[in-house]
Structure formats: C-alpha cells, structure tokens
Amino acid sequence: DCAEEILRKAGSLQDQLKNYQTMVLYLCSHLCEVPEVLKEEKWIPLFVKDTGGAYLRVSAESHITRLNMPQEGNQKWGASRVHKSRVNSLPQMLQEAWYALWAGFSYSGSEKVGEIQFYLCKNMNEEFSLKSVAEKYHFSEPYFCTLFKKGTGMSVIHFVQHVRVHYGTYLIRNSEKKLKKSRKREDLRITAI
C-alpha cells in the first residue's frame, strides 16, 4: 500500500526531521520534478513512481512559503496544511494532501480556516448546517461564513459542493479502472477455459 510505504519512509527520517520546524506533505498524480526551494528548506522524496509521488517539504524556519504547483490536465498536486515537524502528524498530513489532490483545492493560509476545510472534507458525506459547523468552531454563523470566504475565496457551501463533486468524479474514475481490470481478468479466465 502506498500510504504505508510513505509513512514507513517518513518514520525512518525522524532523527533528520529534528533539525526542521515545519513541514508540508505534497502528493502528485504524475511523474514530477522536484521544484527549487529556499536554502533553509529541503524537499524529501518519500514515494516516487511513474504514476505519482509523495514528497515532504521541510523548513528550518517557523513558516513555509506557499508554492504554486502547476495543475495542468491530469497533472495535479495536493498539499497538506503546514505542520510542526513531528512524525506523528504524517498520517493526518497524508489525508489532507489526498483530499487537496483529488478535490482540487489548496488549504487556506489561515490555520483555523485550513482546519475547517479539513473537517469539511473528512465529513463530506454527512449532512450538516452552516450553523452547526460555525458552533463547532465557536463562531457566529455570519462571522464563520465571512472568515471562510476570505480564507478560501469561496463560500462554505460552494467549497463543500466542489469537494463532493471532485470526490465523486474520483470514485467514478477509480470504479471504471477497477471494472476494466476485472473485465480483463475475466476475459483471460474465459479464454483459458
């Protein structure tokens, strides 16, 4: 499993990560080149295949500058939110980057708005109201909506719809791939009979 391999590789870097304060996990859906980063940063490949990869970007500083990764055709990038350099953050970072990759969005630079984006992604199949999410984060509904729109450039409802549509598309594409593989295996089995 790719996720297990990524986490295993990252776990082996625990001593090396002690020299860095912050990190972001990037996933790409294609064979990708490592972009240039600032001298106080490092780009660590965790998993690299023809069909994609996972990279950990770490910084000795308390912040990491945002990289605008190209999103062209089937060549997509997903990045987690910025985390403090702790290996135990990696499972959540992997989940965050996966949502960003397949739902086609970037997390807000605002820590609180990014946290809300992740919450909405994790709970995309649930029914919830703006009021209930606002209350969960101790905001009034109007303030919550304003804060979210300012942090993401879209309304909460638009963001949830965007995530659900892209996730649905991902599920359909994966189902089609599995069906094609299954048909090929069945055709081979029938031919063998």
Feature locations, PLM:
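Short coil turns linking two alpha-helices in DNA-binding domains
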Residues: 140-141, 189-190
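Short, Lys/Arg-enriched, Trp-marked, Pro/Gly-tolerant hinge/linker segments that flank
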Residues: 87-91, 98-118, 122, 131, ...
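Short glycine-rich hinge loops at helix-strand junctions in the catalytic core
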Residues: 42, 125, 176
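Terminal helix-turn-helix DNA-binding modules in bacterial transcription factors
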Residues: 118, 122, 150-189
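Helix-turn-helix DNA-binding elements, focusing on the entry/boundary residues of the two helices
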Residues: 130, 141, 145, 179
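Residues at or immediately flanking beta-strands
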Residues: 74-78, 127-129, 178
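Hydrophobic helix-rich structural segments at or within alpha/beta enzyme and signaling domains
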Residues: 1-110
